[in-house]
UniProtKB/Swiss-Prot annotation:
Organism of this sequence: Arabidopsis thaliana
One family name in Pfam for this protein: F-box
Protein name: Putative FBD-associated F-box protein At5g56700
CDD domains: F-box_AtFBL13-like
UniProt domain FBD: residue ranges: 340-388
Domain F-box residues, every copy: 1-47
InterPro entries named among the record's database cross-references: F-box-like_dom_sf, F-box_AtFBL13-like, F-box_dom, FBD, FBL13/AtMIF1-like, LRR_dom_sf, LRR_FXL15/At3g58940/PEG3-like
Amino acid sequence: MAKISDLSDELLVKILSFLPTKEAVSTSCLSKQWEFLWMWLSKLEFYFSDGSESACLRDFIAKNLPLHKAPIIESLRFCSFFGSLQPKDLKSWVRIAVSRCVRELSISLHDTTAAVSLPSSLYTCKSLVTLKLYGKKVLLDVPRTVFLPSLKTLQLERLRYSDEDSLRLLLSYCPVLEDLSIVREDYDNLRALVVIVPSLQRLSLEIPGNCSSDGYVIVTPSLKYFKVVDYRESMSYLIEQMPELEEADIVVLQYPEKLLESVTFFKRLSIRVIFNTYTETVYRDGIVFNRLENLKLCICNGDWSKLLIQFLKDSPNLRVLNLLVDDYPSSLGDYEPVRWKNNKSSVPKCLLESLETFEFAGYIGTPEERDFLSYIFKHARCLKSSSILSRPERYHGI
């Protein structure tokens, strides 16, 4: 039987690549053959926590990363907790990674003694395909000389921007960027947000309620997937048409028309609406979703039926409807629910001609819900499958 020591170094490095970096490094004490094998690994990850262990790890990286033997670093990740990673160390290691043609770089700073700006060489790295930056101590300070010709995936979550122009400048020089994710915080130094990326195919935005309400400009003509989670009570969007859009995932407190009127081309829509006490529970007339085939609608309000009937009327080719009602107490005291029994003269076209799959989750058997189900089953002529899921814990006035 062959011994593991008889295997080639190339195969042993392949085996080590399936281990976390810490475990892979620990094999260096097995024998002379194993001593430096880990230094050929192309994927490295280092986690810092408080205490002497982090100091040892810093010394280890400072000594060994400059001597790393892999000609290309496929993936490099640094994650720091409790101020254990020093800014000057991180800058030095990123420079080394750039010199080794790093393809994916992930930096997560949950807490450090000072904000860390990344070296200017990172912003002209020709090999970089994926960049992920997390944490309020990461400072995005983009130099005037910036060009990332290979960058396709960019994630910017809860970090700081040196000024209003940093994000716009960075995006302007990523000619093949396809996937962009931005999670904002109130401390990030941005007021407006401008995303003008002709090549972008996926865009995800998360905006907490305490962020600024200045204008958001989105120009992404190649976009196929759009996700926005916006908890602000006031919002302003300027969105150019997205003719290639296939899917949208929207979570808003109110005013869904601010987004819906600009993204009507999708085939699949998932939307969660949480209305407040001052909002009418519909969007404006004139918005039609001719391409919409799959709708997942979650309404966190007792006044759910008015929005639902409008979606049904404005989606003439709808094939799949997933409805989740997770209501709070009715926010509109004079709200008049849809009278499903008396709504015979204007049956939505999708019920008569296209709806095939229907699911209702959160059902508790109110008179309005029973009338709605009777309406669906009476008029949905093409229906092939349906399911009604109860949710006992759902709030309904108790």
